C-alpha cells in the first residue's frame, strides 16, 4: 500500500502534565476520533487520580482504549501493549475513525511505531533474583553491574529507573547477551498507518514545573492518598512480598505515596518527593522526545495557532463537515 494511501493517525506525545489529554479530546471531537492511551500507568485498574486517568465523562464523550487492562499486582509489557494497540487501531480505522495515540510512555510509543527487537520473554525467577539483590545492594549497585556487562544499555538507563535496570539484567542473565545486542537487531512489523507525531512541551521549564506542582496538589485534594490506601488494602497486594517492585507501584507519585503511607517522612516531605520525582520523569521524557527527529514541537499555550495549522494540514478541516452532518 503506498504511503499516501495508508490510514492517518496522530500521536500526541510530551512530558507529563503538558496538556496531551485535553488536546486528544479536542482532536477526537473535531476529527471524529478515538483515543488510544500510550501510558504505562493507565493500564492498571485502581490507578485513577494519581495516574490522571480520563474520568467517566471523558470516556463517555470519546471512546478510549487500553485503559484498565491489568490489576495492580500484575505486569504488562511493551510487547503486549504494541499488540493490543495495533488491534485497537485496526478496529478504529475499520470504523472510519481517526486513531489518536496519546501519552508519555516512550517505550510504548517505540514498540508501536518502530517495532521491538526480538527480546527474550520475561523470566519470573530471574526477576525475583534481581529484586532480591536490589534489597541487598540497591538499584544503584545493580546499575553498576549493568555498566560492567552492558555499558551501552547502562548509558541509556538512569540509575533511578529500577524497572529498566531489572529488565536489562534479566535479558543478559537468561540469554547471555546484553539487551543492547537484542535492541540493535532489525525491528519487527511496523504500524501500517501514516502518523503525525506532535510533541506538546512548554518552552520554559518553569511553566512545566508549575503545571506539575498544581496537578499534584489537585490530585491530593481529590483523594489521591485514599486511593493508594485502597490499592494497598487489596488482598492480592498484601500478599506481594515487595510491592514496591511492582510496575504499578513504581509509577511516579504512587511510589512516593506508598513510602509515605509506610511511615517514611511527613506529608510535606512526601509532596516534595513526588514533585521532584515527577520533574525527573518529565526530564527523561523530554530527553527521549528529542530523539524523535520527525516529530513537530509545540508549546501548548503559545503555539495554539501553529498547532491547529499542523493538524489541519495533515488531517484536513473536518469541522464544517461534522457540524453539517450533526455527528
From Swiss-Prot:
Query: What residues does the record give for site: Interaction with substrate tRNA?
Result: 105, 127
Q: Where is this region: Interaction with substrate tRNA?
A: 39-42, 163-167
Has UniProt tagged this entry with the keyword Transmembrane helix?
no
- From the UniProt record, which GO molecular function terms apply? ATP binding; tRNA dimethylallyltransferase activity
- Tell me which residues bind ATP: 14-21
Quickly give the catalysed reaction. adenosine(37) in tRNA + dimethylallyl diphosphate = N(6)-dimethylallyladenosine(37) in tRNA + diphosphate
Q: Which UniProt keywords apply?
A: ATP-binding, Magnesium, Nucleotide-binding, Transferase, tRNA processing
Q: Which family does it belong to?
A: Belongs to the IPP transferase family.
Role according to the record: Catalyzes the transfer of a dimethylallyl group onto the adenine at position 37 in tRNAs that read codons beginning with uridine, leading to the formation of N6-(dimethylallyl)adenosine (i(6)A).
Its name, as the record gives it, is: tRNA dimethylallyltransferase
Q: Which organism is it from?
A: Xanthomonas oryzae pv. oryzae (strain MAFF 311018)
Amino acid at each position: 500500500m503506498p504511503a499516501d494511501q495508508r490510514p492517518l493517525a496522530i500521536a500526541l506525545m510530551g512530558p507529563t502534565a503538558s496538556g496531551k489529554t485535553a488536546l486528544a479530546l479536542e482532536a477526537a471531537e473535531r476529527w471524529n476520533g478515538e483515543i488510544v492511551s500510550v501510558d504505562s500507568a493507565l493500564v492498571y485498574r485502581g490507578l485513577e487520580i494519581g495516574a490522571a486517568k480520563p474520568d467517566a465523562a471523558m470516556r463517555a464523550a470519546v471512546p478510549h482504549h487500553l485503559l484498565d487492562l491489568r490489576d495492580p499486582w500484575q505486569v504488562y509489557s511493551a510487547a503486549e501493549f504494541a499488540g493490543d494497540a495495533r488491534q485497537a487501531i485496526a478496529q478504529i480505522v475499520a470504523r472510519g475513525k481517526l486513531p489518536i495515540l496519546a501519552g508519555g510512555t516512550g517505550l510504548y510509543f517505540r514498540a508501536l511505531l518502530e517495532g521491538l527487537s526480538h527480546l527474550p520473554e520475561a523470566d519470573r525467577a530471574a526477576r525475583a533474583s534481581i529484586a532480591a539483590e536490589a534489597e541487598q545492594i540497591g538499584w544503584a549497585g545493580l546499575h553498576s553491574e549493568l555498566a560492567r556487562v552492558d555499558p551501552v544499555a547502562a548509558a541509556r538507563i538512569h540509575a533511578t529507573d529500577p524497572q529498566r535496570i531489572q529488565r536489562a539484567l534479566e535479558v543478559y542473565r537468561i540469554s547471555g547477551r546484553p539487551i543492547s545486542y537484542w535492541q540493535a537487531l532489525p525491528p519487527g512489523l511496523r504500524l501500517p498507518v501514516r502518523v503525525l507525531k506532535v510533541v506538546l512541551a512548554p518552552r520554559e521549564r518553569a511553566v512545566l514545573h508549575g503545571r506539575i506542582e498544581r496537578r499534584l496538589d489537585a490530585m491530593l485534594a481529590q483523594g489521591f492518598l485514599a486511593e493508594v490506601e485502597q490499592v494497598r488494602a487489596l488482598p492480592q497486594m498484601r500478599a506481594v512480598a515487595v510491592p514496591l517492585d511492582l510496575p504499578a507501584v513504581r509509577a511516579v507519585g504512587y511510589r512516593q505515596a506508598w513510602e509515605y503511607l509506610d511511615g517514611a517522612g511527613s506529608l510535606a516531605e512526601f509532596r516534595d518527593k513526588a514533585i521532584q520525582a515527577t520533574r525527573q520523569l518529565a526530564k527523561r521524557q523530554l530527553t527521549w522526545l528529542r530523539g524523535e527527529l520527525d516529530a513537530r514541537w509545540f508549546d501548548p499555550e503559545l503555539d495554539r495557532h501553529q498547532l491547529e495549522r499542523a493538524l489541519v494540514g495533515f488531517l484536513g478541516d473536518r469541522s464544517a463537515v461534522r457540524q453539517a452532518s450533526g455527528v
